[in-house]
Amino acid sequence: MSIVVKNNIHWVGQRDWEVRDFHGTEYKTLRGSSYNSYLIREEKNVLIDTVDHKFSREFVQNLRNEIDLADIDYIVINHAEEDHAGALTELMAQIPDTPIYCTANAIDSINGHHHHPEWNFNVVKTGDTLDIGNGKQLIFVETPMLHWPDSMMTYLTGDAVLFSNDAFGQHYCDEHLFNDEVDQTELFEQCQRYYANILTPFSRLVTPKITEILGFNLPVDMIATSHGVVWRDNPTQIVELYLKWAADYQEDRITIFYDTMSNNTRMMADAIAQGIAETDPRVAVKIFNVARSDKNEILTNVFRSKGVLVGTSTMNNVMMPKIAGLVEEMTGLRFRNKRASAFGSHGWSGGAVDRLSTRLQDAGFEMSLSLKAKWRPDQDALELCREHGREIARQWALAPLPQSTVNTVVKEETSATTKSDLGPRMQCSVCQWIYDPAKGEPMQDVAPGTPWSEVPDNFLCPECSLGKDVFDELASEAK
């Protein structure tokens, strides 16, 4: 099935509702994706890109229903990755002499995937044009490392459509093709997720390349991406967002993520978050357990944040494997203008937190002091964690803190959360995890200061996932 994009331009791509992993398992496509291919019918017929290789036969069959394959005059490959040019082998088997227009680097990539050096390659550079009749031309713009060396964009004069390749796209599948037809909140989230996880390493290239394209002084009525929606309603809105995101982007937000073996590091994370919120209630704080969270959501939140706190238990004197892997990914993403602090618990011997601090510094973060706890933190240790959070809030504040929070918030919370007001702490009889009403359970939206009697019935123990019925009053507090 084809969709009219504009005039003689048709979408002939493929929706992929089921895909959940991209780039191996490095990117979770929780809302599917699409592989956008475009057929332009003027005096010359042009195909821009193909689809993912797993849809090769289906793509060629559908394309046959649109046009006699022998009538395709030119093929333009903006990017040689398999989700763009994957169907080339199947297509070229039918029309082996059709000229392929691409960058010089793309020839190496295409041959590396398809192994057909005999194909009719035509190298294009920035500013080169191709006349397709009816007074229209294709103008080519090289965009190396956005996000492969072979990448380029193609602009169609007359219709003023920019075929933008991966830039301005998103892994987002919907029966509707255009940006004004889909849920705007979902669309924004997927655009930001895509930029944060794929294009962040190349942010330094984004602004000059966009400036170069704008320097052509060409009107842009539509931006036709390689994945997700076609931007037809105010298409330059996504360009403005890219310029914003490329400028060492940060919000007044702190992300905390951790891994834990015995819940000790998790207790530290909660206490640190409480300290931050006490001192700077303006800052948004998000906590993630890496073992139970979507990795790409964590990285998107790091991208949005002014700083990140990373926690790990110590195992064999080093950090937990999932933390090590995620820090390695952050190193590759090359975040800028962000601060970091490491924390974690250990038993008879430490090592993980120091190692983690070094890795975060190597990843380009401006480091603050780290925090360690031995074994399960007691109330004194948790107060140190809260104080660490308060100090982080002060150090990382983007504006002067409200004086009331600096002077009185700790005293006010102490008086408001006495045991007589909130009732006893409760202990899970299975795993021994303790619910403290003064701290609540932020991961399940149970606010600090919530007595056990007011905790929702669907509450689950964060450690063993059993319900409220397995909890007993803590023995030391039972009367």
From Swiss-Prot:
Keywords: Cytoplasm, Electron transport, Flavoprotein, FMN, Iron, Metal-binding, Oxidoreductase, Transport. Binds 3 Fe cations per monomer. Binds 1 FMN per monomer. Fe cation 3 binds at residues 428, 431, 461, 464. Residues 254-393 form the Flavodoxin-like domain. FMN binds at residues 260-264, 342-369. Its cofactor is Fe cation; FMN. Fe cation 2 binds at residues 83, 166, 227. GO terms for cellular component: cytoplasm. Residues 30-210 are annotated as: Zinc metallo-hydrolase. Fe cation 1 binds at residues 79, 81, 147, 166. Anaerobic nitric oxide reductase; uses NADH to detoxify nitric oxide (NO), protecting several 4Fe-4S NO-sensitive enzymes. Has at least 2 reductase partners, only one of which (NorW, flavorubredoxin reductase) has been identified. NO probably binds to the di-iron center; electrons enter from the NorW at rubredoxin and are transferred sequentially to the FMN center and the di-iron center. Also able to function as an aerobic oxygen reductase. In the N-terminal section; belongs to the zinc metallo-hydrolase group 3 family. This is Anaerobic nitric oxide reductase flavorubredoxin. It comes from Shigella sonnei (strain Ss046). The gene is norV.
